């Protein structure tokens, strides 16, 4: 991602704004963190649209701390994907005309003219689910974390809503059993 950003930056001399949805939001932040220093100076802002965060070792790194002031994360009120891992950057919570994981589609986010309709915070169910999911993810090895996140994105990319709902119900049961077993 950073090599691609550096290549495109050679074709454009002006200021740069990066935007990505889902895994693309994560990659936009990653690219900004790892871009050539001259390119990094041209980055005005990075928008992550319901993109996952990063593990603690990344968000505490100097590269992340350098780019963090330029990052805004935009998530729907029932965000799951955008709240995976650490999310220290400011989040704008937006309204959606869908429920649950279906809010991940930015096409469901509500607008008033050319502005998002915002909410004061994530829904309480989203906050609880994300707390438990991230607690469970923290117990995984890096390889297991990578496989778990890749599996989630594979299911999301398939747009098989029954599979997505089943995956979330299983994840919820795993998280809640982990909560009972480990508290």
Task: Give the location of each predicted region.
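Alpha/beta hydrolase fold serine-hydrolase catalytic domain that processes acyl esters and thioesters
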Residues: 2-15, 37-183
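Gly/Ala-rich beta-loop-alpha elbow adjacent to hydrolase catalytic centers
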Residues: 19-24, 28
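Short glycine-enriched nucleophile-adjacent loop
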Residues: 27-37
């Amino acid at each position: 991602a950073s090599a691609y950003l550096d290549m495109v930056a050679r074709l454009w001399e002006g200021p740069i704004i990066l935007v990505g949805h889902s895994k693309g939001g994560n990659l936009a932040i990653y690219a900004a963190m790892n871009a050539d220093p001259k390119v990094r100076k041209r980055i005005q802002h990075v928008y992550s649209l319901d993109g996952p965060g990063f593990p603690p070792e990344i968000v505490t790194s100097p590269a992340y701390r350098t780019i963090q002031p330029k990052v805004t994360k935009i998530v729907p009120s029932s965000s799951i994907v955008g709240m995976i891992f650490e999310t220290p950057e400011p989040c704008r919570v937006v309204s959606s005309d869908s429920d649950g994981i279906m809010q991940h589609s930015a096409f469901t986010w509500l607008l008033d003219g050319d502005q998002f309709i915002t909410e004061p915070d994530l829904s309480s169910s989203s906050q609880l689910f994300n707390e438990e999911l991230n607690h469970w993810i923290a117990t995984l090895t890096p390889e297991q974390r990578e496989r778990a996140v890749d599996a989630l994105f594979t299911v999301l990319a398939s747009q098989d809503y029954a599979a997505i709902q089943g995956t979330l119900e299983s994840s919820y049961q795993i998280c809640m059993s982990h909560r009972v077993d480990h508290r």
